[in-house]
Amino acid sequence: MDRALIVEDDKEIARIIRYYLSQDNLYEVVSAASAEEALFLARDAYDIILLDVGLPDQSGIDLCAQLRQWHDCPILFISCLDDSNTIISALQQGGDDYIVKPFDNEILHARIQANL
């Protein structure tokens, strides 16, 4: 079973992603609502990290650069921001993929599988 860390401050979106990922019992899902909480939880090993760009205490893009210091697992950004500058910056700071909210469950699964 793959371990996934969801870093998302919107509780409803985090709940939806958790539901999608746990449907087939393919993922053990851990959630963080802030960059600080994510950094604490990231001490453990994960197979994939799903990361929001807009976190309350730090940019998800900056957090990605920090996570890259000790994680080489895929990092997928999930954000409602769909402008080119944000997407390019997220990928340049170590993101492996970028999914725009709202997203389809099947697309989320396909993107995760493509990056694992």
Predicted regions and their residues:
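N-terminal/domain-start alpha-helical segments
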Residues: 1-116
